[in-house]
């Protein structure tokens, strides 16, 4: 349940994402979208295929530079140009979760290495034991047991794969 007096965790105001196809033609993929998400709140972005849902997500996490609008995350304006350090910090706090988990999970890697990849990139551990401990804690957060770290993606049910993707 979201707190009534809390500031929004994510605030999107007047988001526009246009793609120039040619000199005379521009696709308005997202045009003037605004919403707020509060701590503890679950938010569903629903629309038909091609309506811009994924484009909104990619703009928010800065895979695309928005054409216009303001995006505030945890009280910080992330709309304009971000430094490399700001981008790295943002990437540790936001992620895309794909609808088809098998498309986003490397079938040749164990779950420990799939989850550990983010820890490796951001240098979030000092020893292999600390890495393993962090992976197990992340698995616990999504309702999976420590022994799941030794499995490959094909050894999970669809729901479990989705949780690995979230982890």
Name what the model sees in each region.
Residues 1-167:
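ABC transporter nucleotide-binding domains
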């Amino acid at each position: 349940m979201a707190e009534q007096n809390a500031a929004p965790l994510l605030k999107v105001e007047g988001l526009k994402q246009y793609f120039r196809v040619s000199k005379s033609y521009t696709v308005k993929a997202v045009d003037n979208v605004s919403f707020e998400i509060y701590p503890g709140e679950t938010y569903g972005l629903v629309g038909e295929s091609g309506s811009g849902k994924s484009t909104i997500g990619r703009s928010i996490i800065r895979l695309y530079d928005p054409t216009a609008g303001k995006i505030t995350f945890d009280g910080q304006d992330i709309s304009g140009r971000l430094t490399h350090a700001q981008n790295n910090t943002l990437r540790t706090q936001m992620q895309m979760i794909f609808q088809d988990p098998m498309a986003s999970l490397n079938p040749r890697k164990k779950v420990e290495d799939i989850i550990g990849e983010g820890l490796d990139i951001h240098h979030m551990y000092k020893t292999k034991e600390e890495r393993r401990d962090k992976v197990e804690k992340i698995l616990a957060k999504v309702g999976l047991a420590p022994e799941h770290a030794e499995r490959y993606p094909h050894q999970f049910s669809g729901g479990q794969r989705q949780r690995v993707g979230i982890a």
